[in-house]
């Protein structure tokens, strides 16, 4: 005789809808269990469901010969999005069986292991983000872990980068998904007629968000279909496209592929982000657990990179993860039903005690089941990782821990989630300490289809031994740990006289002008600490490195090579005998671009190593900055304050290191004078190359000054003027008359003109960077200059959130002064905060063979909405300046040599060339081709030339299309386009790397069977993509899958036959 299953009495038509809070359903259902016991019944969504909350009952339901998974409730509503996907199909639906057979291998142990590097890449982005934001930044824990896990599943499973950490807002898929999950939960407890008729507005919005999710999935599939060779690994997407049932040979339809793409994006990141969020809640509220977990990482990993080999050895962290999932299974319910084909119309559970009708849903409440005191004891609600160590975990009663589901319908991505969770936890504990943003925070549960902590925020602080300048190198095993200098030293007074200044030499290498500007700023800061610094190029110091004073070196690395004014110095230094610099005291600061991993900071590190080899004594740890962060000047200042000045014993000073200029403003006249650092060229023509509405790209022809020479591939350095609109803003702020004249006293440590009059207009237009983002020191100085408490507090907040509020928004000193009128600084003080105007470099787009007296440039005009939120336009300083030049105008220029190999080959008859570019990266190759035109007209039989060009549309921004077409007809070059917005006109290729892969036989023949030289010019993203596809062609040609072999071959190729020019 069976017993009646208890439960609260419902209302007509709507049943028990009012008994369940859709916003907090899991907690609500658990409370009902507390009232009605381990089994109860509710009428929800138009049907009666049974809810269980004991280990004994779920153990019975886990018998797959009697029961199977039932898709119901919110999960059934999710079928509106992904139909009969692997996650949402009923067990007897053919689509589930087919997808399961095809996709199981894609989640096997070897496949998951092969995803480690991509997981590590995404995890490193999170680590670097938290490091850069600093300990004052408030971290939305669930939000950032959601970005992490979404990007990881997208990259690992479908080779797609959502780049969530580089966007302020969530990816559209995530925002739509959250809306859909929330509404699916609400729809699950409402009768169908209520959903369809009463909530029509919600239904319309629901369908719109579903359409967004499906569109994104369709775009991913379409991209892969259009470029099937773009991804050579057998990722999940390729498995869905190419996989077949081993027995029937049947594959997944596009519709089924889209369904499963969506469900993997949902299930593959929602549950794991919740797990990590709950874990860090417990780590932060249990210091003893945190200490043990961090100690395990320190002892196992140390300061090296976390590797795949560490994953199986993080036993305590694994226990923490298990215990977290016990208390908070992020997929909090499993719904069962009697197995299809079961003969009886009904069955029983509970030892025959409770009757279950055919197809009736039985919901296992995992939060309650996994806290069953019969299994876990009286402390079942406490977080105790020790109960989840391997030996104890393996001896637990069957089916008492089921966060990944049951049997054959269990989570197919369990191994993926586990590896990802172990990796990110280890990396975060290795590098950070954490604290709650609100010390009084009490755990809140936020529920959609899964559960996460609600309103959970924390702070992350780099551990004492972690050097933020070398963090990224450490993550990837490319840098050694830097030392930490403690304790301030007494500083020099600003009142130091010229006679009291100690000597210092600052040596720099610079082609773009950035490091030169940094060297000048360091000299100004040095004066405030008692040093009179001499600033020189590195080449000028050959055989002249002083031994009686500190020597500070500031240098970049250009694709692993020294800048042009440091080449001789590097050669000289490498040839020195050991101990040749025995009495030299030095320190090095380097600039680099992290996109070039193999050559990142090569020259600064080489300089440091060679000085040490030659017996010099290092003053302070080498500083390494990354220009891609966009805050290189603030990083440089931070290195000075944290490393250089404390090591020299002048950590602090009585005043500001950036001495204010005692400028006398003469309002009576306008004797204007402009200092010229380069020779004057004359504009012959200036034309727009793109159609209206497209990003503006231009082409200018310049008559060079007499005697100025260049080679194809060289750069032209242009000294620009600030836009008059920006200059006018300064005049308005400073309340200067338009003909004001200023004088900077002679002897002031600056690169600006001193000891003579100069018009304020000329000074502001041509000598200082008005749009450069403010530095941290600028903010502190501005705050100290305001008598207004509100302004001081506001500026303090800006400084606390510097990366997000200043650097990312590119707020200049002028922007801040306009926003906070209470700041009271002089015009001279304002000028002292600004770095000097620096030249910008552009690849020359012509050949001197055609006309040695002229040079042409091709560039994109930067004109976009300002990140500051001011409503103004952000105008690129030099690109805007060049765009405004007209015939007859004069512009200050100088030639800068390209990298040694970035020129047409000296033996063009025997060496083919392959050129790849995106956008205005075409510039140097136009020069190459113009040179070939001249050579062919001279009767030379040249080796083949191939040009791969990436742009948007053949009619709107295919630059110099007619000229190139004529050259192709003349046999000068064979051109292969990739149109991102018209790929049907470029063999289905959207990007230059796609076209290279499409023509890989040509590239293979040139690089492997011939002696072609490969040139690449474009942005860092395109450069990396082209590099990757060339390596892929190598692996495809050799039949090798080893990344190390491809990397070794590629490094050899770069020595002589692969050359790149990357622009910002």
Swiss-Prot record:
Gene Ontology CC, one term: cytosol
Record domain Flavodoxin-like: where: 504-644
Domain named FAD-binding FR-type: residues: 676-905
Chain positions recorded as heme binding sites: 411
Alphabetically ordered keywords of this record: Electron transport, FAD, Flavoprotein, FMN, Heme, Iron, Metal-binding, Monooxygenase, NADP, Oxidoreductase, Transport
Pathway: Secondary metabolite biosynthesis; terpenoid biosynthesis
Disruption phenotype: Impairs the production of ascochlorin and ascofuranone, and leads to the accumulation of ilicicolin A.
Chain positions of site Important for catalytic activity: 271
GO function term, MF aspect, one: flavin adenine dinucleotide binding
UniProt biotechnology annotation: Ascofuranone is a specific inhibitor of trypanosome alternative oxidase (TAO), and quickly kills African trypanosomes in vitro and cures infected mice. As an essential factor for trypanosome survival, TAO is a promising drug target due to the absence of alternative oxidases in the mammalian host.
Induction: Expression is induced on AF medium.
Record's cofactor remark: Binds 1 FAD. Binds 1 FMN.
Annotated GO biological process: terpenoid biosynthetic process
SUPFAM superfamilies the UniProt entry points to: Cytochrome P450 (SSF48264), Ferredoxin reductase-like, C-terminal NADP-linked domain (SSF52343), Flavoproteins (SSF52218), Riboflavin synthase domain-like (SSF63380)
EC identifiers of the protein: 1.14.14.-
Pfam short name (any one): NAD_binding_1
Cofactor: FAD; FMN; heme
Residues where FMN binds: 510-514, 588-620
Chain residue ranges for the region called Cytochrome P450: 1-484
Signal peptide: none
Domain of life: Eukaryota
Reaction(s) catalysed by this chain's protein: ilicicolin A + NADPH + O2 + H(+) = ilicicolin A epoxide + NADP(+) + H2O
Keyword Flavoprotein belongs to the record: yes
Family assignment from sequence similarity: In the N-terminal section; belongs to the cytochrome P450 family.
Function: Bifunctional cytochrome P450/NADPH--P450 reductase; part of the asc-1 gene cluster that mediates the biosynthesis both ascochlorin and ascofuranone, a strong inhibitor of cyanide-insensitive alternative oxidases and a promising drug candidate against African trypanosomiasis. The first step in the pathway is performed by the non-reducing polyketide synthase ascC that produces orsellinic acid by condensing acetyl-CoA with 3 malonyl-CoA units. Orsellinic acid is then prenylated by the prenyltransferase ascA to yield ilicicolinic acid B.
The name this protein goes by in its record: Bifunctional cytochrome P450/NADPH--P450 reductase ascE
Lineage of origin: Eukaryota, Fungi, Dikarya, Ascomycota, Pezizomycotina
Gene name tied to this protein: ascE
